[in-house]
Amino acid sequence: LRTIMGIMRPIRKAPGTKLVSYEAAVDGTLAGGTSVAEGDEIPLTKMKVEPKTYGDIEIAKYAKSVSVEAVAKYGADVAVEKTDEAFLVALQNKVLGDFYTFLNTGSLAVAATTWQQGLALAKGNVLDKFASMDRDVTEVVGFANILDFYGYLGDKEITTQTAFGLTYVQNFMGYSTLFLLPAKYIARNKVIAVPVENIDLYYIDPADSDFAKLGLNYTVQGETNLIGVHVDGDYSRATGDMYALMGMKLWAEYLDGIAVATITPAETKSTKTVKAEQ
């Protein structure tokens, strides 16, 4: 997930800590400059550091169970491995669904008349926003309705990729990654753009020693421990049970650094003529 989204800053939250980041900025205007005479004391520029508090991460707990009857009927490959994969994808989609909902609250509004123009203006506006804050942008990721994407392509061929339930295309019209989503996540005629520098991933490590003190040992994989799982056999029910623990939140540091482009197709000449005649 981190690799696909290009997330730059995974931030581990230790138990007992609060989610707080700090922003530094010039308090007022720069002092000094060419007005300082030779030998005069150079005035200090006043700076300020302000804390920014985020909503706390809630721990989510899930479990699934596979019976010996299911294994006998379908085999372990289907009853266990396939359901394990589907279970983990569903967990990821829960996190992504919350993130997509949050993206739609972006306050950098953009108006466009075509889908292509919407993509271009959405990216241009976030680049302009971050440049005005003297912030660097290395990559911009986009989110679009999948039907709008294929409607734009028409009979043109382009290679899309699918991983962990995500459909996306890389290096498309200036976007490092363009995610193609169904209408339940992003409406038609809407495009969202956000720099990867504006995406933070806060997470709780399920393998944290504080949890182990409860006798809860979760297995994690990868560089960032996002989802912890534990598999145990329940002889009293003759089932194999998988337990999952996760606590993560995808967050955008600047709401006005998320461009939401709304596309309103321009009226055709014939349509305007008909209305005029009416």
Label each PLM-derived region with a short phrase:
Residues L1-K61:
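Assembly/oligomerization interface modules of large self-assembling protein complexes
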Residues I4-P10, L44-T53, N125-A131, G165-Y168, ...:
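Intrinsically disordered, low-complexity boundary segments flanking structured domains
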Residues V71-A79, T114-N125, G215:
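Alpha-helix capping and helix-coil boundary motifs
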Residues T105-A183:
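Extended, solvent-exposed, turn-rich assembly/linker loops in the middle of proteins
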Residues T160-Q278:
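Sequence/fold signature of self-assembling virion shell proteins
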Residues D27-T45, V71-D77, E223-T239:
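Short charge-dense sequence patches
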Residues M47-A111, A238-M248:
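Long, contiguous amphipathic alpha-helices that act as assembly "spine/axial" helices in icosahedral shell
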